[in-house]
Structures are given as structure tokens and as C-alpha cells.
A protein has these predicted regions:
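C-terminal boundary of histidine-terminating zinc-finger modules
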Residues: 111-126
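Residue-level detector of flexible, active-site-proximal loop/helix-junction positions
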Residues: 104-105, 114
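Conserved catalytic-core segment of NTP-binding enzymes
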Residues: 2-10, 14-103, 109
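P-loop NTPase catalytic nucleotide-binding module
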Residues: 74, 104, 123, 134
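C-terminal alpha-helix
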Residues: 127-135
Length: 136
């Protein structure tokens, strides 16, 4: 992976690698050359535990910058106390929060139609745009 990244560096400002779920060899290969990691989690207890483990591994591998995106947030469930608020997730994980994506049926519709969500006038599409601006 390090060799591949070094070959790509001269031609690209950003190289994004989508890691497989879990912490197996695919994950370890993906972070081998990382200078930054963006951990994406949902506000569910099991997902937050997994994200915390991932952040620990990233820290142990001396990844200099770790950011967080909280995905599939449902404000109605947060208000009823059925889902953890984003602020609590950020506090538990203790890394820089660069954005949240609220659950949006337009994501499913766009995915099924094969259309880009970023072109949609929807909450999730705007969230993606904001997160992209914070990455750059």
C-alpha cells in the first residue's frame, strides 16, 4: 500500500482509501501510509465501541490527524432519548468532529437510481458538501 500511495502522490492532492469494516489485515494495509484518517460511525453503542477501538489503533500507529463523521443521525430518535446525541458521540471518541449526516431517504432513492446524492437538494447532500469542504 505504501508503494502504491507513493506512486499516486505526485498526481493527486488527496488519495482517499475506503477501509473495510473491522480491524483485519485490509484495515492495517489501508492505514499503512495514512497521514490522516476519517472515522465514520453511527450513533449506536456498538458502532461507537468499534470506532473507539479503531481510533485507538490509529493513535497506536501514530496517524497524525484523526477526524470523525457521525452518519445516519435521526433527530427524532435523539429527542426521544432512543439515540445518542452527536455531541455525546464526539465527547466519547475525543477526536475532531468534521460533520454529521442525518438519515435521509433521498440517499436510498439516489443510490437505487444511480444518481449522485451531492446533486440532490437534500439534507444529506448538503452535509456531504460541508464535510468535503472541511476535508480540504
Amino acid at each position: 500500500m505504501i508503494k502504491l500511495i507513493n506512486q499516486l502522490k505526485p498526481d493527486y492532492d488527496y488519495i482517499i482509501i475506503d477501509c473495510p469494516a473491522g480491524i483485519e489485515q485490509g484495515f492495517k494495509n489501508a492505514i499503512a501510509a495514512a497521514k490522516r484518517a476519517i472515522v465514520v460511525t453511527t450513533p449506536e453503542v456498538s458502532a461507537i465501541r468499534d470506532a473507539d477501538r479503531i481510533i485507538g489503533i490509529l493513535n497506536a500507529n501514530e496517524i497524525p490527524r484523526i477526524d470523525l463523521v457521525v452518519n445516519r443521525v435521526r433527530q427524532d430518535m435523539v429527542k426521544r432519548g432512543e439515540m445518542m446525541p452527536v455531541e455525546d458521540v464526539v465527547e466519547i471518541l475525543g477526536v475532531n468532529h468534521i460533520g454529521s449526516v442525518y438519515d435521509d431517504e433521498n440517499i436510498v432513492i439516489a443510490s437505487n437510481r444511480g444518481t449522485p446524492i451531492a446533486t440532490k437538494n437534500c439534507v444529506a447532500g448538503r452535509a456531504y458538501d460541508h464535510i468535503a469542504m472541511r476535508i480540504c
